[in-house]
Amino acid sequence: DYEQNKNIFDNAKNKEDLDPLLEGITHINVYTKSKFSLGKGLSNLANIGFDIDEQHFQSLEGFWYWNITGKRYDFFKNMTGFEAKKKGLVLCEEGSAVTNSDDPAFQEEIKRAIRAKIKQNPELLTELIKSTLPLKHYYYHQGTKNILAFKITDKSKYQWQLDEMERIRELCQKKMHEVGQLSSYPPLENELAKITRPRFK
């Protein structure tokens, strides 16, 4: 409901955290519709493959639902992010889930996958190292009457994923400072001014 979502946004304590017009200024949105390749690439739905425990996954979303359903359905390994989410939700609704995203053990598995994905994809790792803005996660869509309507995701539920990504970034930046190589990666924010901010009609 547009009015309900707008009220949620209006009442938010930190509106800048939820405003796509400020992405690249106050934050990077980890979302398939992010303005930046970093935000898109860090999304679980991104089709960025990785190997873990001698197995290959086409997307982190596939790994997510492969774990939630007890590692029984190997077809998740070859699915795109959106395919995995669609099939995974159906299986969970049918009672195939053996755990959930609140389970600490499950969260550790996803963190391992996040580390593998970032480590094995140099371009994504480089972009992460170059960035300095906080990582956020929210959805939005264009509302009526030329006004944005926001569908707000409960960020606290998935903040543990963003925390892991930021932890990786901090460790890599610290290591590169120690070896004097960080200067070869100018901050991503220096490049953002070249990108035109989107206009919502």
Predicted regions located by residue number:
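Charged, low-complexity intrinsically disordered segments
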Residues: D1-R199
